[in-house]
């Protein structure tokens, strides 16, 4: 299957097949403490956040998922237009197809035309570095959308179970990426792809100079499950194995804590199963700087601009409600808001040797 057709199939599967992770985000184990006297009016809540030198109206970005085909360009155009109007940030899907097939670049370029002032994030995969991508290919992707940053995605699990996968992740690839990053004119964001980020990985990335991290944890779209569907359709021998591993990964809530704990000065994007404004609030209170959404945005975007705007407006209200009811006047205050960690998340963190009292001071200092 061509890379272009694979992109279309991925989106079709995300829209019409059940590929949500069988493991939760564990955000349900985070309880924000209600304050019966918020000490402010609801209209006083300030949801603005800083990202890539720009101010967002909400601590929220659309993380990369689509591009590489004319039909996907239409979806990107809708998302970009709404992002521009509402003051959000946006990442595009992997641009490998456009770097190698420039005739497909329009499906990505449309984002900058529709969002002239929004922070836009380009996207390439680390396996491409292993296969020879260098500064030129990275600059091609950045210039394609006049990006404010470029995300480099880590997806070893997806690559492993993909029929055409390239599970090539030697340490030399990260070292090469570090060298490439020094020649770029925008920051590099390193992101996972739905299976989460451990404290070991976060520390390794930070040691190589990467401190803007998208944890993309388990609990949202499972890209192993996406490849499981593709394996089933093709009768591929990897089907049963991909089914077995469809719940593999680190839940989003645990990924946030592990990353903040191991790299206290990192800038964390919390994505993976973020579905509403309360999820955004919990993610930030746990230690993230902003949150990211992909799958729910895709589902609303294919139904049109107004449907997507309505969705984001509802998310904004839910976030503001959580901030008001915790007495959090702004996003920084929300990061200091009292919370209770219980259940499986507490068990996870304790078994990983994370002292909650120590983490409490780390998250408040972020």
Curated annotation (Swiss-Prot):
Pfam families from the UniProt entry: FMN_dh
Keyword DNA damage: no
Gene Ontology cellular component list: cytoplasm
GO biological processes: isoprenoid biosynthetic process
Domain of life: Archaea
Residues that, per the record, bind Mg(2+): 159
UniProt: FMN binding residues: 63-66, 94, 123, 191, 216, 221, 273-275, 294-295
Name the record gives this protein: Isopentenyl-diphosphate delta-isomerase
Provenance organism: Metallosphaera sedula (strain ATCC 51363 / DSM 5348 / JCM 9185 / NBRC 15509 / TH2)
């Amino acid at each position: 299957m061509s890379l272009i057709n694979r992109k279309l199939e991925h989106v079709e599967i995300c829209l019409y097949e059940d590929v949500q992770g069988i493991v939760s985000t564990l955000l349900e184990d985070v309880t924000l403490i209600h304050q019966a006297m918020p000490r402010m009016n609801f209209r006083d809540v300030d949801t603005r956040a800083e990202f890539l030198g720009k101010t967002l109206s909400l601590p929220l970005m659309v993380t990369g998922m689509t591009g590489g085909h004319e039909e996907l360009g239409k979806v990107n155009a809708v998302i970009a237009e709404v992002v521009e109007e509402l003051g959000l940030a946006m990442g595009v899907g992997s641009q490998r197809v456009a770097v190698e097939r420039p005739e497909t670049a329009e499906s990505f370029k449309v984002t900058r035309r529709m969002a002239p002032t929004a922070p836009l994030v380009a996207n390439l995969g680390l396996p491409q570095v292993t296969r020879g991508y260098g500064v030129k290919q990275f600059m091609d992707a950045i210039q394609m959308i006049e990006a404010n940053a470029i995300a480099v995605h880590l997806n070893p699990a997806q690559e492993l179970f993909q029929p055409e996968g390239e599970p090539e992740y030697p340490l030399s690839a990260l070292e090469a990426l570090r060298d490439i990053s020094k020649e770029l004119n925008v920051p590099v964001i390193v992101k996972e792809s739905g299976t989460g980020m451990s404290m070991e990985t976060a520390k390794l990335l930070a040691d190589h100079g990467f401190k803007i991290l998208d944890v993309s944890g388990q609990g949202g779209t499972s890209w192993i499950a996406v490849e499981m569907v593709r394996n089933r359709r093709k009768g591929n021998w990897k089907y049963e194995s991909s089914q077995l591993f469809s719940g593999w990964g680190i839940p989003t809530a645990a990924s946030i804590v592990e990353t903040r704990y191991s790299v206290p000065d990192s800038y964390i994007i919390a994505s993976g199963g973020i579905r509403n404004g309360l999820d955004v609030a919990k993610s930030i209170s746990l230690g993230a700087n902003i949150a990211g959404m992909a799958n729910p945005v895709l589902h609303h975007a294919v139904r049109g601009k107004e449907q997507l705007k309505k969705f984001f407006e509802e998310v904004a209200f839910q976030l503001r409600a959580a901030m008001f009811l915790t007495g959090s006047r702004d996003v920084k205050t929300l990061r200091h808001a009292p919370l209770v960690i219980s259940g499986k998340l507490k068990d996870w963190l304790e078994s990983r040797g994370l002292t909650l009292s120590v983490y409490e001071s780390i998250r408040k200092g972020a």
